[in-house]
């Protein structure tokens, strides 16, 4: 298997053996074979990526993530699923996709998406709907967009994006705070925390030498 990784601050473009194009967001990892089989095209994603899948009706394309499997023949879509996060989101830009449980013993269909729809999973709860804007792909231009997300989700994302370990000493902060904002990658992690502080009272200590942040 070949491995492609997007380093800090970089959106990495990868062209797969069948001509499929993949853009990896910050800290994302993609595993794929040197050559696809004649029956199916399988890749494994840890992180966020945008896919433009080369059309081949005879050989389906699968994106494996920790909890959910995406099945397509040729389409454009975004998938975000970081290992250990218990969350998943797929946004369909063009074409259609099928979503299945990623279980080695038994795959079960969850739902199908058509153009302009999204599917999300958070701690085992499913949600589908219409995409509200084009901000879903803003990360491809180095912009991070958060729309009423739990504070924990924002912290998990920026910890990955900027390669910091974030420790929260007051768990109530994670339970009560939700965040909305749009940030440039070049703004840096401390700028993001200062902006969030304007709406939610918390203190933080940052250790840039060891890439550690403590929030209380």
Language model feature labels by segment:
Residues 1-216:
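A residue-level detector for the "anchor" residue at the start of short, highly conserved motifs
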């Amino acid at each position: 298997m070949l491995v492609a990784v997007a380093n800090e601050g970089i959106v990495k473009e990868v062209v797969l053996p069948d001509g499929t194009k993949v853009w990896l967001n910050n800290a994302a990892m993609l595993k794929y074979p040197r050559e696809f089989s004649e029956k199916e095209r399988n890749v494994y994603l840890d992180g966020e990526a945008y896919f433009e899948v080369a059309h081949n009706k005879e050989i389906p394309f699968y994106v494996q993530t920790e909890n959910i499997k995406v099945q397509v023949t040729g389409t454009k879509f975004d998938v975000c699923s970081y290992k250990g996060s218990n969350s998943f989101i797929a946004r369909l830009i063009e074409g259609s996709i099928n979503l299945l449980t990623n279980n080695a013993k038994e795959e079960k269909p969850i739902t199908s998406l058509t153009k302009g729809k999204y599917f999300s999973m958070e701690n085992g709860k499913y949600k589908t709907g219409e995409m509200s804007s084009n901000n879903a792909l803003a990360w491809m231009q180095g912009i991070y967009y958060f729309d009423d997300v739990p504070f924990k989700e924002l912290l998990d994302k920026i910890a990955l994006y900027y390669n910091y370990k974030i420790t929260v000493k007051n768990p109530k902060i994670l339970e009560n705070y939700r965040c909305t904002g749009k940030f440039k990658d070049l703004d840096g992690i401390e700028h993001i925390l200062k902006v969030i502080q304007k709406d939610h009272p918390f203190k933080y200590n940052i250790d840039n030498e060891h890439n550690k942040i403590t929030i209380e």
